[in-house]
Amino acid sequence: EYIQCWHETLAVNMATGYTWITGQAQAVLVHAGVGLLQGAMGIRCAMQAEVPMLVMSGESVTLGADEDLPIEPQWYGGVSPGGADKLVAPFVKWASHVPSAPTLYQCIIRAGEMAQRAPMGPIYLDVPLEHMLEDWSPAGELRQVPPAPATQAANGEIEALAADIAAAKNPVIVTEI
């Protein structure tokens, strides 16, 4: 269900609260540049609280060069210098951009998968305005989102591993901190 909010911070915080209550990760679409940074505090809090979320905003990749697209003059000044994904990278789990309209669906699916993997957290996708305006038809077979992998061993796995190590002639265990 689409809910329009008048403020980006409110939208991000509503998505966080809804996810806490229902356990269902949410998607938030915010305005490019200023809207993204307006929601930054909420996005950072979601990252610290390990709340899975997909945050998206758009910018222009043609900067008004295509006369058929309604690109406003603000894009010429670089609403998001270096790309919006660079703005949010320090406070999201992963930040990327959608390369083309046909890849939008799979990019969103992949981002949703990543958001729900441990440690959970918000994922950012920069979806260029040109891709949002392009006509798109879903493929005949859309890939379903697989469940996030288990973050702890299932019953019996630890015992089976211990037995394998005990039975090994020269076991080697490599660990990292």
Model-predicted regions and their roles:
Residues 1-177:
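N-terminal alpha/beta PP-like core and its mobile active-site loop of ThDP/TPP-dependent enzymes
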